[in-house]
Amino acid sequence: PTNSRPNPGYFKATIGRIVRYQAVLPSGQTTYENATTVDYGSRRVLLGETLAFQPKSGGIPLTHESHGVGSLVFGQDGTLLVSAGDNASYSSADGGSAAETYWSSALTDGILQAKENVGAFRAQLVDSLAGKVLRLDPVTGNGVESNPFYSAAEPRAAKSRVWALGLRNPFRMTIRPGTGEHEPELGN
């Protein structure tokens, strides 16, 4: 409610942010099924608290026009899964500082750290949110203890939120219960 209208002339790096609101129970209803409004006072930023802070932003870095934030789905365990592309250029072999990306403003604005200016290789950096599937607690936005790189001392750190890494452009996800393990050797 406090954001201004998008500026179509804005060409700089920014972040992907996930915000949660509580729906308002419709008058005379006992369920939220037909809810059409939210309580703005319930706003909670799960990911991307600030555009930039030192040493860097808490959001998914967006340095190019594609391969950005993809899907949100809930796992069967209630966790929130978020897909995010590497946000590297699709028109060149982006190993960092690609001319058609906004890497320079991302560094200046604290959206990227210098070690993250590696283009598509961000997907391999456990301390970057780019090129990942993130697994979050849907109430707090913290990483989940069973995530592979979780740190109890830093539950909001990028590594604590990483569920899978090394992904170029995971722009769509779905949960298909009963489809089995993801291990190929199990044959299902």
Model-derived segments and spans:
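Surface loops at the rim/top face of extracytoplasmic beta-rich domains
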Residues: P1-N188
